[in-house]
A protein has these predicted regions:
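A conserved hydrophobic helix/loop-capping motif in glycosyltransferases and polysaccharide synthases
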Residues: 18-30, 34, 41, 52
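Acidic helix N-cap motif at the loop->helix transition within catalytic regions
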Residues: 30-32, 58-67, 78, 118
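A conserved acidic beta->alpha catalytic loop
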Residues: 37, 53-63, 81, 113-114
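Conserved donor nucleotide-binding strand/loop of the catalytic core
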Residues: 62-94, 98
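Short beta-strand-to-loop acidic/aromatic patch adjacent to the donor-nucleotide binding site
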Residues: 100-114
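Conserved donor NDP-sugar-binding/catalytic core segment of glycosyltransferases
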Residues: 114-149
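Terminal low-complexity segments of carbohydrate-biosynthetic enzymes
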Residues: 224-302
Length: 302
């Protein structure tokens, strides 16, 4: 007779645990909510979560260690260098082959984001239903510009660092081709999205169908309250970073198109000497922060 007993605590142990990378740099205030959100988004799922604590000078590591005692499958990976790109590289090239090789799907998340109910299942289904796609992305369900951001991501078939997934075979290719994100790069998700659409060959035109945005897969994050001066300065810095992101990508795009994926610099600042060729473009109010970004990139070389 067949054993029709439900598995203990609702788990289907035949399913491989889902690997999740979480980037965390000084996230002691948000990391528990982030981790909690995964478990409540996918009740009954087993996870293999790796919190990539990079350059933390706060209590992030202590918080994660305590959390891992009470929750199966939560692992702290402690990295001295505070750089999100380096932490991503460590996950893909060191953690995956050793700890979670040959999985069908890998999830990636920021330590200050929260996954909405069913978000990971939606992305897994997105990849299953679109065998041609290398990646499935979640969309924001909060934030001031949420409506615009969602529309843009659906139109451009975009991916943002807050929450996305990569097909296992694509991760294998990243490992095989030794693809590493440049250190100090601002737009890690922008570059990754481009590499996915290029199918790791920047000589080819972009193929938008390589990314599946999943409207039912959502994430939330804390917005800046507009009340205190410290938030204004944080917002200003964020706008400068957005400016830098565009300029870095301009330098990188040119180089990759002409020299191929092997031309990815180990550190994005290697390309800063060419920032003298970049032109300041009018962008309304953001022209000012763009100008600041450009000055900083040029000053870096002096």
């Amino acid at each position: 007779s067949m054993n029709t007993q439900p598995p203990p605590n609702g788990r289907h142990d035949t399913q491989a645990a889902w690997p999740v990378m979480i980037l965390a740099h000084n996230e002691e205030k948000h990391i528990v909510a982030c981790l909690d959100s995964l478990f409540s988004a996918e009740p009954g799922r087993r996870f293999e979560i790796f919190v990539m604590a990079n350059g933390c000078t706060d209590g992030t590591e202590t918080v994660v260690n305590e959390y891992s005692r009470a929750h199966d499958g939560v692992n702290l990976i402690s990295i001295p260098l505070g750089d999100k790109n380096n932490a991503w590289n460590v996950f893909v090239h060191d953690v995956v082959p050793l700890r979670v090789p040959d999985r069908e799907i890998y999830f990636f998340m920021d330590g200050d984001a929260r996954a909405c109910r069913g978000a990971l299942t939606e992305m897994a289904n997105g990849l299953r239903e679109n065998p041609y796609a290398h990646a499935a992305s979640a969309l924001p369900t909060s934030g001031r510009s949420m409506g615009r951001d969602r529309a843009e991501m659906l139109k451009d078939r975009g991916l943002v660092a807050n929450l996305y997934s990569l097909r296992g075979n694509f991760v294998k290719e990243l490992i095989r081709k030794k693809v590493r994100l440049p250190l100090k790069l601002e737009g890690d998700d922008g570059l990754l999205g481009a590499l996915i659409k290029w199918d790791l060959d920047p000589g080819k035109p972009w193929d938008m169908n390589r990314i599946v945005p999943c409207p039912k897969a959502g994430f939330t994050f804390e917005s800046f309250p507009w009340t205190s001066p410290s938030h204004w300065s944080a917002y200003w810095r964020r706008m400068v970073r957005y400016g830098r992101r565009k300029y870095e990508f301009e330098l990188l795009g040119k180089k990759l198109k002409s020299e191929g994926i092997g031309a990815l610099p180990a550190d994005i600042t290697e390309l800063y000497p060419q920032s003298s060729t970049l032109k300041l473009r009018w962008a309304g109010i953001h022209t000012i922060t763009n100008w600041v970004a450009l000055q900083e990139m040029r000053r870096f070389c002096k």
